[in-house]
A protein has these predicted regions:
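Active-site loop/oxyanion-hole signature of alpha/beta-hydrolase fold enzymes
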Residues: 1-33
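Gly/Ala-rich beta-loop-alpha elbow adjacent to hydrolase catalytic centers
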Residues: 34, 38, 42
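Conserved serine/cysteine hydrolase catalytic core
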Residues: 116-172
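Flexible "cap/lid" loop of the alpha/beta hydrolase fold
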Residues: 43-48, 52-88
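Conserved alpha/beta-hydrolase catalytic His-Asp/Glu region
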Residues: 68, 83-135, 139
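Active-site loop signature of alpha/beta-hydrolase-fold enzymes
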Residues: 1, 40, 64, 159
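Conserved catalytic-core motifs of eukaryotic protein kinase domains, centered on the activation segment
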Residues: 3-9, 67-70, 162-163
């Protein structure tokens, strides 16, 4: 995450178009695996550029809009004084002032680049924050992907609910 170019366009359609270009540059067809935001991007890729995908695996996400909002997490990340942080423990302590969930902090801190001076975020927080409604949403897209697809989710998943399965079958019969 975060090693690719940054763009202010952070929609699933833009991500799918980027993926299609990468796949075309590497031979024209790929087996695609996507989880969470990557899963939504992979689903849009399959629907908009189906010929680019040989097989699709989507982990713990459905082609639906969700009601949660990650903006408070982004706000907490942006609030860190990165020039004063020297290591992950200090970053965690600073982030703990805004976010109590230790596992969430550990996940978010994976996106800190400790090799830069000062430490920096590998991800474009401004683009994510500005695109949040689209990120938690689902684009107005039609069509179906007829290739092989596997959706994986745990029994206690908060992201693939029973009512989501009908929507999955609509796009991925």
């Amino acid at each position: 995450h975060g090693s690719s170019f940054w763009s202010d366009a952070h929609s699933y359609e833009a991500m799918a178009d980027d993926l299609a270009k990468v796949i075309a540059a590497h031979g024209g067809q790929a087996d695609v695996v996507g989880h969470s935001m990557g899963g939504k991007a992979a689903m849009v890729l399959a629907l908009a550029h189906g010929a680019a995908i040989r097989r699709l695996l989507v982990g713990d996400i459905a082609p639906v809009a969700y009601q949660h909002d990650q903006s408070p997490n982004i706000k907490a990340m942006k609030s860190l004084n990165l020039s004063a942080i020297r290591n992950r423990a200090e970053a965690d302590a600073a982030l703990a002032q805004s976010l109590a969930d230790e596992s969430l902090r550990a996940f978010l801190l994976q996106s800190l680049d400790f090799k830069t001076t000062p430490i920096s975020w590998r991800i474009n927080l401004e683009a994510l924050e500005g695109s949040m409604p689209g990120i938690v949403g689902w684009p107005d897209i039609s069509g179906q992907f007829e290739g092989p697809v596997l959706f994986l989710s745990g029994g206690a998943s908060h992201y693939v609910q029973t009512e989501s399965r009908l929507k999955i079958r609509t796009y991925f019969p």
